[in-house]
């Protein structure tokens, strides 16, 4: 009997070319030969190896339904449209990506220019200064190169009041 589940753990949803398949499964003893496939699929020796392989690929595709597609990439936690921070306080912006296919990459920008070394789900400037005011955004990209832009957040840095 063909162990389709075992084969699926090795190859996923798509089988490689037949010569790669047989070389790989030889070590796992799932399907040892074309003769074995002919018997399992009810084909005679009159069927060519190419025909046997075609029938096996069809049977493989039907044996275990494909995995459902990943939900779309979204930001379950997005940036707010605006925020204020006191000068000297920490400026922290954060998003949470869900769906898509991880891992994710993050590209933060301020006023349309990339922020060097800002590559995580959270961007923190430990001590905000007046020049940190501006429009911040992050683009999240999953491993299949699907991207999602955050809301643009207008950051205001309030000056500290002397002696206050």
From Swiss-Prot:
InterPro entries for the chain: DECO_N, Ig-like_dom, Ig-like_dom_sf, Ig-like_fold
Any GO CC annotation of this UniProt entry: viral capsid, decoration
Gene3D superfamilies, alphabetized: Immunoglobulins
Region named Binding to the capsid hexamer: 1-72
UniProt xrefs under PROSITE patterns: IG_LIKE
Subunit structure, interactors included: Interacts with the major capsid protein; each hexon binds a single copy of the decoration protein.
Comment text on domains: The N-terminus binds to the capsid proteins with high affinity and high cooperativity while the C-terminus displays an IG-like fold.
UniProt-recorded name of the protein: Decoration protein
Organism this protein belongs to: Escherichia phage T5 (Enterobacteria phage T5)
Lineage: Viruses, Duplodnaviria, Heunggongvirae, Uroviricota, Caudoviricetes
The encoding gene: N5
